[in-house]
Regions:
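Short N-terminal targeting/anchoring amphipathic segment
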Residues: 5-6, 70-71, 79-100, 111-114, ...
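Nucleotide-activated donor-binding/catalytic signature segment of Leloir-type glycosyltransferases, i.e.
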Residues: 241-263
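Conserved donor-binding/catalytic core segment of Leloir-type glycosyltransferases
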Residues: 194-212, 218-221, 232
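Donor nucleotide-sugar binding/catalytic pocket of nucleotide-sugar-dependent glycosyltransferases
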Residues: 147-187
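Acidic donor-binding loop of glycosyltransferase active sites
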Residues: 264-280, 290-293
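N-terminal strand-loop element at the rim of the active site
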Residues: 7-12, 23-70, 97, 159-164, ...
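Membrane-proximal helix-turn-helix segments that form the acceptor-binding/catalytic region
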Residues: 80, 132-152
């Protein structure tokens, strides 16, 4: 059985997501990849195997807009030709592939096609008009793809149950979210210039989005006298959607964080915070666990494993008072045992072999 892993996007966490899955099959010569990257060349830098094809497409505003209506013909043609060349039996579309809905459905008539659903529902967001339009069109295309394929994969147990209710006649599969740790992160030791002399901070890491509830932890560190004596670092690109002022104990690094900076950023943090209002799945837990940094996360379904596996504590989603109290409790606690558990959890749950075996079982059903 010849398998093709497809990713046409490396935006946000999709690059690490796809490359980690592809790298899980590094030794399998019957598993190929077909990926499309932009000027960041994420896949070229992180995929270990040469058993595939990498195409290039600029991440311009024009390309983003036109892709909502017309997928690049050259890429569609190349994908179909590659499937024939390698005598592919199974195709797994890893990263939504928003513009390629018709192509995916068409291929599902000739191949065994799997499609990974990342976010079944749109997250809370404050966006300008053209971004709202693009967002709406994107989710419309994703809905078409879900309707048109027979095999759907998700990394969220709650989403798995919802998909089974929505599509009782389809095959719905679950596998654990892969680690977002790549070789650029493990080998990197670049210090963010904004953190000169700053140590033992509480870290929020990730793109700033409304559904991630960043304003909750910001307000907690602004208003509580004890938290005012501690440092909060908010690190990630994206539009700051809430009013923010300059405080000595709050450092905002509002830019893209290079992979080479992530090790320093986490190694010098005391703990990590994820105050999400909603979340179906996320790879951020793998990063905290890899570096052994205790977690404070909201109790939305995906993050409830934090308390279950003793990797930190959960607070009631959207509740600033509960978040504040949990922060104050954990900041004065001995965190060494949690750190050890996190690293053990990472080794047993985020290994490449675990991902490989899970997917092979799915493909063979």
């Amino acid at each position: 059985m010849n398998i093709l892993l497809v990713s046409t996007s490396s935006w946000a966490g999709m690059g690490p997501y796809a490359s980690e899955i592809i790298n899980s099959f590094y030794l399998d010569r019957n598993v190929y990849y077909f990926v499309v990257e932009d000027e960041r060349h994420f896949f070229s830098k992180n995929i270990l195997s040469d058993n595939g094809r990498i195409l290039y497409k600029t991440n311009s505003k024009l390309n983003k807009l036109t892709a909502l209506f017309w997928p690049p013909c050259s890429i569609v043609k190349a994908l179909k030709a590659y499937c024939k060349e390698k005598h592919i039996d199974v195709i797994h579309f890893l990263t939504s592939e928003v513009p390629y809905s018709k192509t995916i459905i068409s291929l599902s008539h000739s191949y065994k096609v799997f499609f990974t659903v990342h976010d079944l529902h749109s997250h809370e967001a404050k966006k300008v008009f053209y971004k709202q339009f693009r967002h709406k069109m994107m989710y419309r295309n994703l809905a078409k793809t879900r309707q048109g394929v027979s095999n759907i994969i998700t990394n969220s147990t709650s989403q798995e149950e919802e998909l089974k209710e929505m599509f009782p006649m389809k095959n719905i599969y679950f596998h654990d979210f892969p680690s977002l740790i790549n070789k650029a992160i493990t080998n990197g030791n670049l210090k963010p210039v904004e953190l000169n002399g700053i140590e033992n901070y509480v870290l929020f890491f990730g793109r700033i989005e409304q559904y991630k509830g960043v304003e909750l932890v910001y307000e907690a560190f602004v208003n509580d006298p004890l938290l005012q004596k501690n440092t909060l670092v908010i690190a990630g690109s994206g539009e700051v959607y809430f009013p923010i002022q300059k405080y000595e104990n709050i450092i905002l690094i509002n830019r893209y964080i290079k992979d080479e900076e992530i090790a320093w950023l986490f190694n010098h943090a005391k703990l990590t915070v994820y105050p999400y209002i909603s979340a179906t799945q996320s790879g951020v837990l793998s990063v905290s666990c890899y570096f052994g940094k205790p977690i404070i996360a909201s109790d939305v379904p995906f993050f409830r494993s934090v308390t279950k596996n003793k990797l930190g504590v959960n607070f009631k989603a959207g509740d600033i008072e509960d978040l504040t109290n949990k922060l104050k409790q954990i900041l004065v606690s001995d965190l060494s045992a949690i750190s050890i558990r996190e690293k053990e959890y990472y080794m047993s749950n985020y290994s490449k072999e675990s991902i490989r075996q899970s997917l092979l079982e799915i493909y063979n059903r």
